[in-house]
Design a protein with these regions (language model features):
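Short active-site neighborhood of thiol/selenol oxidoreductases, capturing the structured segment around
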Residues: 96-120, 126, 139-141
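Structural microenvironment flanking redox-active thiols in thiol-disulfide oxidoreductases
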Residues: 120-163, 172-178
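A short beta-strand-turn-helix
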Residues: 84-107, 133
């Protein structure tokens, strides 16, 4: 082969390599990561056209969507257009807002409901991202889609927004119009929408925080480049790692052996432990023997009305018993000032094992329809929980665990 031919061949090989690299760089199918973990959530769709991952190496961020100073357009034909926020029932922290109003912004759409413990455990990250990236082009929009009827109440949602320190826009989705438009079925869920209005990332449940933050950073850099700004000036202190914000609750889902348990006959996934069982819309006098209690099943004592979403105490006193396996337990409850004493292993919960809603005497008062944290132990294990209720009208909706 003569020198000219060798030179021509080398040039063709170089061009082929560049073309192949560019195809990888702009293809959503070839540059896709799917991450999943038991109880920690699932990333069902993920594309970051400005992140390249090699096996055995850390993700490396490409600041500009350029190769050898040549501009390659991003092929968005396979991305799904983010649906508009549908019929809404109110706005918090914002005037009426539409997704179309946020073009040229990177938008994090977060589906939540305020009594969901899984969403509550994501709050420190949402607050942290809002503080770090709001002035760099990120807008978080919380779409509050209720699980229970009382979560449709705007005052209840506002109280939760204040309690959790949320400063970003909230849209009330009481009729699940936006929920259905996104074909969502989970709390919590995060969609990342790029500055052009396409969904580029979709994560179900908890976890995936480092990955989510990297995609936020990548989309912000992409936005800067598309706006003819120098994306290299958009620097991130934690480009290679995600700091854990204050207030994060550590959870090992493999150690939680008790599933979420619902009280209402329409929501219950398991029958009651009592032989009387559920009787729709009827008031039933329940009894149980401590020797009959089995793990992961709710037992009641007293006169309770069977409502679709909850059990409502009709007698002046009542009792709830549960043997669970986890590190912490919460109850979603409502009423009006009823007093509940919480004990485990025959002793009132107090000290570090008692949840933040308990007094030093192991008691708490119902002050609204919300989630109450009853226990927070240092380690996982099997525990026998008793709730002694004083006051007619107490409503129990669900137990959740951590």
């Amino acid at each position: 082969m003569n020198k000219n031919n060798r030179t021509l061949l080398a040039a063709l090989i170089a061009l082929s390599l560049i073309a192949g690299f560019a195809t990888y760089f702009i293809s959503p199918d070839l540059n896709k990561t799917v991450a999943q973990g038991k109880g920690e959530g699932v990333t069902t769709k993920f594309d970051s056209t400005i992140q390249l991952t090699q096996e055995g190496t850390e993700n490396s961020t490409i600041t500009h969507n350029r190769i050898n100073n040549a501009q390659f357009p991003i092929d968005k034909s396979q991305f799904k257009r983010a649906p508009e926020f549908a019929e809404t029932n109110g706005y918090i922290n914002t005037a009426p807002i539409k997704l179309a109003d946020l073009r040229e912004k990177v938008v994090l759409v977060n589906f939540w409901t305020y009594t969901c413990i899984n969403w509550i455990r994501t709050i420190p990250y949402l607050v942290d991202w809002n503080e770090k990236y709001a002035n760099k082009g990120l807008v978080i929009v919380g779409v509050h889609t209720p699980e229970f009827e009382f979560e449709k109440n705007t005052d209840n949602v506002k109280a939760a927004v204040d309690k959790f320190g949320l400063r970003y826009p909230i849209v009330q989705d009481n009729n699940k119009e936006t929920w259905n438009a996104y074909e969502n079925r989970y709390w919590p869920r995060i969609y990342l929408v790029d500055s052009g209005g396409d969904i580029r990332y979709d994560h179900i449940g908890e976890g995936g925080y480092a990955e989510t933050e990297k995609v936020i950073q990548s989309l912000l850099q992409e936005r800067a480049a598309q706006m003819d700004k120098d994306a290299s000036l958009l620097k991130f202190d934690n480009a290679n790692k995600t700091a854990i914000p204050n207030g994060v609750q550590s959870v090992d889902f493999s150690q939680i052996k008790t599933p979420e348990l619902y009280f209402g006959y329409q929501f219950a996934r398991k029958p009651l432990g009592n032989t009387e069982g559920h009787k729709a819309n009827q008031t039933v006098t329940y009894t149980f023997s401590p020797s009959d209690i089995k793990s992961n099943i709710i037992y009641l004592d007293g006169k309770w009305k069977n409502n679709a979403e909850n059990m409502e105490l009709e007698s002046e006193t009542g009792r709830i018993a549960l043997v669970y396996s986890a590190k912490s337990v919460n109850i979603i409850a409502g009423g009006n000032g009823e007093e509940i004493s919480v004990s485990e292993g025959g002793k009132l919960l107090s000290g570090t094992s008692g949840g933040p809603d308990l007094s030093e005497e192991g008691k708490f008062l119902i002050d609204g329809q919300r989630l109450y944290t009853l226990s927070m132990h240092d380690g996982y294990g099997n525990r026998s929980l008793i709730l002694d209720v004083k006051g007619k009208g107490f409503q129990a909706y669900a137990f959740s665990f951590g």
